[in-house]
């Protein structure tokens, strides 16, 4: 609950009851409280309530937004819940339930209203169709590095996100997998920190040597992929300025690298970042950027404690003036919070409002203030989906997460024949780089054995493999030593294999969001790709349901005589 206490008469008897009293409220059950004696307060108070949370929402870090805060200020008018009007000697005590993101302990400090700084949103829509990075205002040194890497034209989401982040807005970036979201936030960050940043008058006097950007990813694979992207842009001479802090790696070596290299950018998983921070080896109070990649996954309950520490210790929430803040918080740098994912459910919107200041939702060719986002309604058909409607932006989370250049099919097969159907599918489509998804780890080895027995080079990838083994498997698969990678949900997010031309679902994904993330492993950066779901006849209704939710055509097919034969939906039914 959020309390506002007026500073008025002291030593006023507020509650006086010989035995009991009843407490009423929107969020409090009627219960009897035993009061053996009168209780004396320094302020007189009465209660008012206001509901601010959707009780039907799922329990996530985002749905539990905010923290309990006590603000002290002048007398102000409040709405009573009943009873006689309070006397002139009493001050108003407002109670606004606002549940903590992580726990129910009160916040240590309170920001006065004068400390809040409103940011002005300026959107130059002409930049949405930018043909070069020069048009987006990136510094010359950074543009030279991009040209050396063969990157000259920004993608649509990069054209929309780079100017907004450069204006120091907190942002939620949503776009389909493989659209260039990583560079969409890395480039404006590297424009402000590191050797490629734009020159400023403070360059000579800037003594900062600590971490200035923290990027959090839910998996080791995604974290290392981001590290490689940063190293590629910084070049071989400056790649020491980025440090990985992922789980599964040697912690002592990571801490030694932090001390020796003094990196400006840290990329890691929540557990390892929180662990090293708690050990006093990672100092992030001066951090200017906090990026949460695949944020919808970081909201899951198992990251609760680690994300709590990261949000509490990385910089200071933007939108506040250091002149109006007292204590240790005033010495922290103001951070810019950026949330990224291909799918943005409404829980992420709530998290962005709680963790950031005046955040905006950035999508390809679109920038929308989060204040305009309302509770979504279900999308049942393509006609219901309007990508330009702010109120429907969240509904489009899964729809817009699919690359536009994909072909979707489903094939009916008995469970014991699925692997053979997989093999015939690969031959019929002449696919050279294939990722096959299953829901469990145990059957992976059996599928690989059957494919190898039929002369098809295959390997497995799952979380039970060690870090070195996983890295070796991925490298060999990308180098073409294996034609098929059989994996589970581990690889559904963040795995970047540009050459992948076919994704096969040997097991049905659990929902449309998982389907979108699996499908996003192919068709990256505008390339063509194919997604085939192999299901049993009793599972076809699930495919049709996902087809409606995603608003994409998933056509029935079969593989006969080495060819793909597409059926009409009416013929199948």
Swiss-Prot record:
Keywords: ATP-binding, Helicase, Hydrolase, Nucleotide-binding, RNA-binding. One of its GO terms (molecular function) is RNA binding. This is DEAD-box ATP-dependent RNA helicase 47B. InterPro entries: DEAD/DEAH_box_helicase_dom, DEAD_box_RNA_helicases, Helicase_ATP-bd, Helicase_C-like, P-loop_NTPase, RNA_helicase_DEAD_Q_motif. Belongs to the DEAD box helicase family. ATP binds at residues 175-182. Its EC number is 3.6.4.13. Residues 421-565 form the Helicase C-terminal domain. A motif (Q motif) lies at residues 131-159. The Q motif is unique to and characteristic of the DEAD box family of RNA helicases and controls ATP binding and hydrolysis. It comes from Oryza sativa subsp. japonica (Rice).
């Amino acid at each position: 609950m959020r309390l506002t206490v007026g500073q008025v008469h002291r030593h006023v008897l507020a509650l006086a009851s010989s035995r009991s009293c009843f407490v009423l409220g929107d969020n409090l059950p009627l219960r009897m409280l035993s009061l053996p004696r009168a209780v004396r307060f320094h302020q007189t108070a009465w209660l008012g309530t206001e509901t601010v949370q959707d009780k039907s929402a799922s329990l996530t870090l985002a749905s539990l937004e905010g923290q309990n805060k006590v603000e002290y200020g002048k007398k102000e008018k409040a709405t009573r819940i009943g009873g006689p009007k309070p006397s002139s000697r009493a001050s108003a005590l407002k109670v606004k339930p606002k549940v903590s993101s992580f726990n129910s302990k009160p916040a240590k400090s309170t920001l006065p209203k004068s400390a809040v700084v409103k940011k002005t949103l300026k959107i130059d829509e002409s930049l949405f169709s930018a043909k070069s990075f020069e048009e987006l205002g990136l510094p010359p040194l950074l543009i030279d590095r991009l040209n050396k890497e063969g990157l000259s034209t920004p993608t649509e989401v990069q054209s929309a996100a780079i100017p907004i982040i450069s204006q120091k807005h907190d942002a939620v970036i949503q776009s389909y997998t493989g659209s260039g979201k990583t560079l969409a936030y890395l480039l404006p960050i590297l424009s402000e920190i590191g050797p490629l940043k734009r020159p400023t008058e403070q360059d000579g006097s800037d003594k900062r040597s600590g971490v200035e950007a923290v990027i959090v990813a839910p998996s080791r694979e995604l974290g290392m992929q981001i590290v490689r992207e940063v190293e590629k842009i910084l070049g071989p001479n400056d790649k020491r300025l980025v440090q990985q802090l992922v789980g599964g790696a040697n912690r002592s070596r990571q801490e030694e690298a932090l001390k020796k290299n003094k990196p400006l950018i840290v990329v890691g998983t929540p557990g390892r970042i929180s662990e090293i921070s708690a050990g006093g080896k990672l100092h992030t109070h001066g951090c200017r950027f906090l990026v949460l990649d695949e944020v919808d996954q970081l909201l899951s309950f198992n990251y609760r404690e680690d994300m709590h520490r990261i949000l509490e210790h990385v910089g200071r929430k933007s939108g506040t003036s250091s002149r109006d803040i007292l204590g240790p918080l005033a010495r922290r740098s103001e951070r810019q919070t950026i949330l990224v994912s291909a799918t943005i459910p409404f829980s992420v919107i709530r998290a962005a409002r709680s963790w950031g200041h005046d955040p905006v939702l950035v999508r390809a060719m679109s920038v929308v203030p989060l204040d305009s986002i309302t509770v979504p309604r279900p999308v049942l058909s393509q006609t219901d989906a309007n990508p330009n409607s702010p109120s429907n932006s969240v509904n489009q989370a899964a729809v817009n997460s699919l690359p536009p250049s994909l072909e979707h099919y489903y094939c009916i097969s008995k469970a014991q024949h699925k692997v053979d159907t997989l093999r015939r599918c690969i031959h019929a489509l002449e696919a050279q780089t294939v990722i096959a998804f299953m829901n469990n780890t145990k059957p992976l080895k059996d599928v690989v054995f059957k494919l190898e027995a039929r002369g098809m080079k295959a390997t497995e990838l799952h979380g039970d493999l060690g870090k070195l083994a996983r890295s070796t498997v991925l490298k060999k698969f990308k180098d073409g030593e294996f034609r098929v990678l059989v994996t589970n949900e581990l690889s559904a997010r963040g795995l970047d294999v540009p050459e992948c031309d076919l994704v096969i679902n040997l097991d049905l994904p659990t929902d449309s969001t998982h389907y979108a993330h699996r499908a996003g492993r192919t068709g990256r950066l505008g390339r063509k790709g194919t997604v085939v779901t192999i299901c049993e006849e009793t599972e076809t209704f699930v495919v049709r349901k996902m087809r409606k939710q995603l608003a994409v055509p998933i056509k029935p097919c079969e593989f006969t005589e080495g060819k793909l034969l597409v059926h009409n939906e009416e013929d199948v039914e």
